Amino acid sequence: MENRENTVEVVYGDITRRNNIETLDSYEKAVKKNAWKNEMYRSYYSFPKEFKDYVDENESVKQYNGSIYLDYIYIDIDKGDIDDISFQGYVMDCVSQLFDKGIMAEDINVWFSGNGYHLKLKNVFGLQPSKELNTKL
């Protein structure tokens, strides 16, 4: 379950500008303000608010060994060499298969991004926070 006090690592512009830690709320406000102006990236996982203290003290996210959370599951589907119509059909089939597994439409967000589509799923599989979550996916 999503905790709005959780933090994420955010990169603004150049991918080497790491170690910026923000709450999910701050990150989402920044996306609304900057997304069309500058490149932005965020960590796949979110972290408890103590993660910011760790990064401030160590000046890096490296070797963080606390719990990690999964607020969303992102699936990146690249187009490759197939034609547009076939690719759209493939993506629709992928989404239909998710529906067949019992995932509800309100739990999925789909958008196009130049080379393909992104699917953003809520944590519909109930993955729990843990230190080992990244090894389970």
Task: Identify the meaning behind each predicted range.
Residues 58-65, 95-112:
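Catalytic micro-motifs at enzyme active sites that drive phosphoryl/nucleotidyl and oxygen chemistry
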Residues 1-72, 77-90, 128, 135:
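DNA replication initiation on ssDNA origins
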Residues 72-75, 102-130:
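Histidine-centered divalent-metal-coordination microenvironment in nucleic-acid enzymes
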Residues 86-105, 131-137:
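Long, well-ordered alpha-helical scaffolding segments within enzyme catalytic domains
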